[in-house]
């Protein structure tokens, strides 16, 4: 009667390794720049997300605004100074010349494996 319990325990031990959880790490945590300068933000995934990565901008008291989807496509109405690149595990958001309204919080988000 102990064998099934032991087997179940072993299977449960392995479950965390099969969930496919993807961790995204952004860098740098903060940037000190001035208007007119170039900003480069990085996002690294713990495993490949192909090109299924989006970038968002959020300002205080506002909902996040989609900037880039599928790694390199600008969302509707997003200025050309915003560009995205990368695939697999390494991605970059570049703001070619910062405008005063660009000073905000930026997030990356993957959509390769929704729960």
Curated annotation (Swiss-Prot):
Residues 109-115 are annotated as: Complementarity-determining-3. SUPFAM superfamilies: Immunoglobulin. The keyword Transferase does not apply. Residues 21-43 are annotated as: Framework-1. Residues 1-20 form the signal peptide. Pfam families: V-set (PF07686). It is found in: Secreted; Cell membrane. V region of the variable domain of immunoglobulin light chains that participates in the antigen recognition. Immunoglobulins, also known as antibodies, are membrane-bound or secreted glycoproteins produced by B lymphocytes. In the recognition phase of humoral immunity, the membrane-bound immunoglobulins serve as receptors which, upon binding of a specific antigen, trigger the clonal expansion and differentiation of B lymphocytes into immunoglobulins-secreting plasma cells. Residues 70-76 are annotated as: Complementarity-determining-2. One of its GO terms (cellular component) is plasma membrane. GO terms for biological process: adaptive immune response; immune response. SMART domains: IG, IGv. Residues 77-108 are annotated as: Framework-3. Its main location: secreted. The keyword Cytoplasm does not apply. GO terms for molecular function: antigen binding. It comes from the Eukaryota. It comes from Homo sapiens (Human). Residues 44-54 are annotated as: Complementarity-determining-1. Residues 21-115 form the Ig-like domain. Disulfide bonds join 43-108. This is Immunoglobulin kappa variable 3-11. Immunoglobulins are composed of two identical heavy chains and two identical light chains; disulfide-linked. Residues 55-69 are annotated as: Framework-2. Keywords: Adaptive immunity, Cell membrane, Disulfide bond, Immunity, Immunoglobulin, Immunoglobulin domain, Membrane, Secreted, Signal.
